[in-house]
């Protein structure tokens, strides 16, 4: 056999040449394949631009191009990243923190295929015998509850919130968002020929009311066109009520909250299944009971089943359930709706899909996989990342936690700063070399926040009594006012249930979370924070013109792109294309608006500035006050005109905090504010939290980061475990007392962090 090396063996590195996506500064870097590579650097240094925006994006674009144009029309349109060359790419699988599904029919069980395996087990060995397996699916007509149609809940719709009985259809009697006069839905009702469009609804007969509200889907013909007519209530249920509430448009969500009352389905008691499916048992349990069990309990139940005829299936199901437990999700149940998962939980559920995969030589791309994980769970996550690597895969991880950086085979550090000051490779190599380097990450890798010895004295308390949301066990606890309180515990211990389920009801509480900021692609930090108002006023005064000229959403908008900066072209069966507007060249404004300047800059140039640059430009007034708040929360690198849709969860939370900081004497509730923060940024966050407390505010933080725990005045630790094993307060007191006296999981890891 020849000893000559195979030519294919030379392709063992991903080669990036001349990457310029976003703030990347002509980056050249080689990344070893079949290794675990961790990308570090400040928030905004260019990590995601390199990993997601360049490497993963190009891999997915090349794969998508192998499909027919018909198939591509149903896939997202991906442009080629701004890079000179990318070599030796393998197929990329992105495991990010985007929430899963906008549909109530998607659950943890359906997302991981555990529900499908469980259905087959029940169809094969259940008593009485019932086949096929679709009989046990709430998404199948054979298995769904006839009352709630497989949703597990019923709805009562207030008819008077749907229509105005004093008007006719032509006068706009239907008051549902999207059904106004002239809309497509309105035209279907008016031109169907089934209703008198000029007759007041108050004068409708019982038959006409039935046709308007309840008629099942019916084919109607208008001229030469045929279309489907459906009663208003079934149409609303189908188009609105099956969606995740958080994914609804603002007007639709407000309408649903106003017009619809939801309740657990009385017929299936929330199980979603019909009586036949609920009658079948395996080892004394129905499939509904199994789906409602905690995953760790279900894993133990499945392991005890002795059914040789379905042993391979039980092994596969057991492996999936054990994987969920290993990623710290043992407290979930298979019937938990996917849309209710946090970003970190959603990412770990996606990860489980790939752990049992037969694929090899794939590139897995992770975005902060430790988000939402207690230090106790991070070690288990690290083992899973290493197991993916050991199957011959390339694992690329964007991460800030030292525990995960420590297991890397290869580290790529970007910086030296954020935004325009970032985008350069400051270090590549192993972890030991990073620790010895003089980069910001290297200097902070072993940095430890000192334990707060002298805690601040509270000015009062907010009492929570009898809290029993989700897994809480009738918890009574006092939240001290005027200090920094950190609520800790493993994932699923009840932290969010305690804080979010009890505190928002109190007056003066400001909840600053990581949920998506609602708005269009035109929304940006300048519009969201109100910064654009003083900027427009300054331009108007300097040029003696109307302030409305300097809005890309009204008078000042480019007529070609309507102020969007891009023109969207529909290519029928092929994917639509967004191209930079030729008239305004992406600047969004009319030429005559851009002719007006403020200290030598036009409005588009100001909106292109980062927060840091804008602080130097606006040295006083309301604009400077808002910019200072954005800088204080660590968003100095953000561009004023950057679309809000591009922000991460951590960035969204800090943007909301910047808006809320103007309030005095408030109680701020923050959910994992260290998400997305570099080790150096954590120090800045702690200084900000201290300033809020010193200004008379109260800060309550749900957090896993040991640096925040050590810096707290008061700690409330929940546990001792997750799910049924959690829901109790296992410690209350100062960080020093936690380290000295407690034996909780949090105490052990905080002691290890402090080297005690």
Task: Give residue spans per PLM region.
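Conserved phosphate-binding elements of NTP-dependent enzyme cores
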Residues: 1-756
């Amino acid at each position: 056999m020849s000893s000559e090396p195979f030519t294919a063996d030379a392709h063992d590195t991903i080669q990036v040449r001349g990457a310029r996506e976003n703030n990347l500064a002509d980056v050249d870097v080689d990344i070893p394949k079949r290794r675990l590579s961790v990308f570090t650097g400040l928030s905004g240094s260019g990590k995601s631009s390199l990993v997601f925006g360049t490497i993963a994006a190009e891999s997915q674009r090349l794969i998508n191009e192998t499909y027919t144009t018909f198939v591509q029309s149903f896939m997202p349109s991906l442009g080629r990243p701004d890079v000179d060359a990318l070599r030796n790419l393998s197929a990329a699988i992105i495991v990010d923190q985007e929430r899963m599904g906008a549909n109530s029919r998607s659950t943890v069980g359906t997302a991981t295929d555990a529900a499908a395996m469980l259905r087959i087990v029940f169809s094969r060995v259940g008593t009485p015998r019932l086949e096929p397996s679709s009989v046990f699916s709430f998404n199948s007509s054979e298995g769904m509850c006839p009352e709630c149609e497989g949703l597990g809940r019923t709805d009562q719709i207030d008819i008077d919130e749907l229509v105005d009985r004093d008007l006719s259809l032509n006068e706009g009697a239907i008051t549902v968002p999207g059904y106004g006069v002239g809309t497509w839905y309105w035209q279907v009702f008016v031109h169907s020929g089934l209703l008198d469009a000029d007759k007041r609804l108050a004068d409708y007969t019982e038959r006409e009311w039935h046709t308007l509200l309840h008629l099942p889907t019916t084919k109607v013909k208008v001229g030469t066109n045929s279309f489907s007519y459906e009663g208003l209530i079934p149409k609303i249920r189908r188009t609105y009520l099956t969606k995740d509430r958080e994914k609804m448009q603002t007007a639709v969500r407000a309408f649903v909250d106003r017009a619809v009352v939801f309740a657990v389905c009385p017929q299936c008691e929330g199980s979603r299944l019909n009586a036949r499916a609920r009658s079948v048992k395996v080892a004394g349990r129905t499939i509904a009971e199994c789906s409602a069990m905690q995953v760790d309990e279900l894993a133990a139940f499945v392991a005890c089943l002795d059914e040789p005829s379905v042993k391979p299936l039980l092994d596969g199901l057991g492996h999936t359930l054990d994987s969920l437990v290993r990623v710290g999700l043992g407290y979930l149940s298979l019937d938990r709706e996917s849309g209710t998962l946090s970003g970190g939980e959603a990412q770990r559920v996606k990860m489980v899909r790939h752990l049992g995969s037969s694929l090899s030589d794939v590139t897995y791309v992770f975005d902060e996989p430790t988000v939402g994980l207690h230090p106790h769970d991070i070690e288990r996550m690290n083992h899973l990342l290493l197991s993916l690597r050991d199957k011959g895969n390339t694992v690329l991880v964007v991460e800030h936690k030292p525990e995960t950086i420590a297991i890397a085979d290869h580290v790529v550090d970007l910086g030296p700063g954020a935004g325009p000051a970032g985008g350069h490779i400051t270090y590549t190599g192993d972890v030991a070399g990073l620790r010895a380097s003089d980069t910001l990450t290297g200097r902070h890798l072993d940095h430890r926040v000192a334990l707060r010895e002298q805690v601040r004295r509270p000015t009062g308390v907010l009492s929570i009594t009898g809290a029993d949301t989700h897994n809480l066990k009738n918890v009574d606890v006092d939240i001290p006012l005027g200090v920094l309180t950190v609520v800790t515990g493993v994932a699923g211990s009840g932290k969010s249930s305690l804080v979010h389920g009890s505190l928002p009801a109190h007056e003066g509480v400001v909840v600053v979370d990581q949920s998506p900021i609602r708005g269009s692609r035109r929304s940006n930090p300048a519009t969201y924070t109100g910064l654009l108002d003083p900027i427009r006023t300054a331009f108007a005064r300097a040029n003696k013109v109307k302030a409305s000229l300097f809005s890309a959403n009204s008078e000042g908008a480019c007529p070609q792109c309507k102020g969007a900066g891009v023109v969207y072209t529909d290519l029928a069966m092929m994917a639509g294309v967004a191209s930079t507007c030729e008239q305004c060249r992406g600047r969004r404004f009319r030429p005559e608006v851009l002719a007006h300047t403020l200290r030598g800059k036009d409005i588009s140039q100001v909106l292109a500035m980062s927060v840091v640059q804008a602080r130097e430009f606006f040295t006083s007034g309301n604009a400077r006050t808002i910019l200072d708040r954005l800088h204080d929360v660590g968003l100095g690198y953000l561009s004023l005109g950057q679309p809000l849709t591009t922000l991460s969860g951590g960035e969204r939370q800090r943007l909301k905090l910047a808006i809320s900081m103007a309030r005095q004497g408030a109680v701020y509730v923050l959910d994992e504010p260290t998400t997305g923060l570099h080790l150096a940024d954590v120090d800045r966050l702690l200084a900000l939290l201290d300033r809020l407390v010193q200004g008379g505010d109260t800060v309550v933080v749900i957090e896993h980061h040991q640096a925040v725990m050590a810096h707290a005045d008061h700690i409330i630790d929940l546990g001792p475990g997750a799910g049924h094993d959690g829901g109790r307060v296992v410690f209350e007191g100062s960080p020093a007392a936690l380290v000295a006296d407690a034996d909780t999981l949090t105490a052990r890891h905080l002691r290890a962090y402090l080297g005690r």
